[in-house]
Amino acid sequence: MEVILLERISKLGQMGETVKVRDGFARNYLLPLGKALRANAANKARFESERATLEARNLERKSEAQKVADVLDGKSFIVVRSAGETGQLYGSVAARDVVEVLAAEGFNIGRNQVHLNTPIKAIGLHKVELQLHAEVEIHVELNVARSAEEAERQAKGEELTSVDAIYGVDEDALRPEDFFDPEADGIDEDEA
C-alpha cells in the first residue's frame, strides 16, 4: 500500500513523501495513529493544503523534545534491584522500568521512546537510548545496583561483581592465629 507520510518516520521517510509499506503496517499503525494518509489524489490535495500546519506542528513537537533532551542528555539515574553475588539481577530492567524511573524524576517519556535491544540483566552502568522525536535522540545512563551506597561505589568506578568487592575484605579476620594457637599441643587443659 502506498501512503503519504504526515511526519518523519525513521527508516521510512520524511514528511510529505509517498512510500510503499506493507498493508498491515499501514492499517494497524500508520493510519490509526495519524502518521500517514492513503496515497490517492484527494489525500494528496488535502496534504498540500495542510502542509504548513503539519510542518509547524512537527517543528513545535521537535522543539519541545529538544528542551527535554537538553535537560536529560547524559544524566545518570539509579535503579535499585536485588541481585546475586555475581551481579546477575533477579529479574531484569526493561523499558517499562526505565519509564518509571524517569517518571519518578519528573520526566514524561513513553515506553515506545525507550530503545533497549535486550533487557538489562546485570548490575553496572548501562547506556540507554531515548528517541524523544524522530530527529531528537539522546542517551541516559542507568546505574543498576543492589543499594544506593553500592550505586555510589559503582559511579566511582568500582567493580562490584565479586563477594569481596561487595562486602569488603577484612584482612584481620583472615589470620590463622585467630583460629588456633600454634603454641598449643591440641589438648584442652580442662579435659586433662
Curated annotation (Swiss-Prot):
Name the Gene3D superfamilies for this protein.
Ribosomal protein L9, C-terminal domain, Ribosomal protein L9, N-terminal domain
Keyword terms, alphabetized: Ribonucleoprotein, Ribosomal protein, RNA-binding, rRNA-binding
Q: Superkingdom of the source? A: Bacteria
Residues annotated as transmembrane: none
Q: InterPro entries given for it?
A: Ribosomal_bL9, Ribosomal_bL9/RNase_H1_N, Ribosomal_bL9_bac/chp, Ribosomal_bL9_C, Ribosomal_bL9_C_sf, Ribosomal_bL9_N, Ribosomal_bL9_N_sf
Q: Where is this region: Disordered?
A: 172-192
Q: Which cellular component appears as one GO term in the record?
A: ribonucleoprotein complex
Here the segments flagged for biased composition (Acidic residues) are 179-192
Write down a Pfam family by its short name: Ribosomal_L9_N
Single GO term (MF): rRNA binding
Protein's GO biological process: translation
Family membership:
Belongs to the bacterial ribosomal protein bL9 family.
Summarize the protein's role: Binds to the 23S rRNA.
- The name this protein goes by in its record: Large ribosomal subunit protein bL9
Q: What is the lineage of its organism?
A: Bacteria, Pseudomonadati, Pseudomonadota, Alphaproteobacteria, Hyphomicrobiales
Q: What is the primary gene name for this protein?
A: rplI
